[in-house]
Amino acid sequence: MDVANTENRCRGFTLIELVAVLLILGVLGSGIMLRWAPGDQSLSAQADLFARNLRHAQAMAMARGVALVLDVKTASNYAITDGTATIRDSAGALQNFTLDNGVTLSVSNLRFDSLGRPLNGGSLMSAAQSWTLSGESSTETVQIQPLTGFVTVTP
């Protein structure tokens, strides 16, 4: 009588399990290393956020059919206003923003008309407008193009 001997089987991990664990550890490790990387990481993130808020102000002006202003109040605070008061988005959130970690912004306002076109005073912009965001050791520039309102961020 031949009885299968299961007691002598080697126990361990399969190749797929080992590869999956190494892959997960690699992803987690790279995320941790990026957070510990030297340099002013928050400056880049804040410049991207400022650019997104410019696009958001433009989109809200078109959606609402009214002129809106990106109002840079101080070097570390800006808001989306109707020219007098800070507005709320469709979710009810007040559109007031503060830069973090000592990042500062050059003070210059921008108005969008109801078609989303950037204005300089009361007329269409004829040249690009720029804002400089400054961190501890570097700067980034956010620029908006005339007529289209295309926004770019450059280090």
Enumerate the predicted regions with their spans.
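N-terminal helix-rich module
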Residues: 1-22, 27-51, 55, 59, ...
